[in-house]
Amino acid sequence: MSATNPFFAPKTALITGASSGIGLELAHLFARDGYRLVLVARNRGALRELATELQSRYNAEVWISPKDLAHPASPLELYQELQESGVVLDVLVNNAGFGGEGPFLNTDWSAEAEMLQVNIVALTHLTKLFLPQIRAREGKLLNVASTAAFLPGPFMAVYYASKAYVLHFTEAIAEELSGSKTTVTCLCPGPVKTNFQKRAGIADSNLLHGPLLVEVQEVARIAYDGMKKGKRVVIPGWKNRAVVESLRLSPRRVTPKVVRRLHEKKQ
């Protein structure tokens, strides 16, 4: 881990998957509001570039920690680094995650195992490690799921299931902490143009060429505002909220067929 300045102020936020997309935009919002930041991602160069920008624009204090959360040891290593540095969190943003497309019979298990490690195991482990100090400081937890969390996902079966875990896990913790001043929020964005789509192999999906698309800056702003207000579930875009509700009310045998059509590629 590398530091730019020691941490003296009480408000510190850790963001995983901070080098691009929603995580990057959230880093800007936290820095704008005076938070000290711990930024985690695989790409050391991108983290350094972001840290420099945040320092220049907001005079932010930033630590970067290049970590691949697909490695089971990474969450504990990160926790121990912060413990040794005397850094205590007020906010944890579990944003890191990725997906993959293809019929389950044909997809690669090693890629899916990494997906489960990042999307589920690392998120849960980081929450287990940092939630005690966040609760002690009456802080906030923001977990990033997806509108996929509400639905079965043909051709992205493991990804959709992993996001259902994140949603239910987050809602359960929110209820457990409902008597405290600590808030727990789950962000469930619909389609957003980020590097996620390229990695998942869905850059030409119908989802990214329709009315459900919300710009990444807007998703981050809505997520940030929802977290500050202590909302349990945040779905950016009224059309996404409407689609989720309508599909949840549809017969269970119908919903997978609708989702399958949404993932069909443009011809």
Language-model segments: what does each one mean?
Residues 103-114:
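Substrate-binding pocket helix/loop in short-chain dehydrogenase/reductase
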Residues 127, 162:
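Active-site helix of classical SDR
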Residues 186, 207-243:
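C-terminal helical subdomain
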Residues 44-45, 66-77, 109:
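The beta1-alpha1 cofactor-binding region of Rossmann-like NAD(H)/NADP(H)-dependent oxidoreductases
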Residues 33-50:
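Conserved glycine-rich Rossmann-like NAD(P)H-binding loop of the short-chain dehydrogenase/reductase
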Residues 19-21:
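Conserved glycine-rich cofactor-binding loop
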Residues 146:
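Residue(s) in the substrate-gating loop at a strand-loop-helix junction
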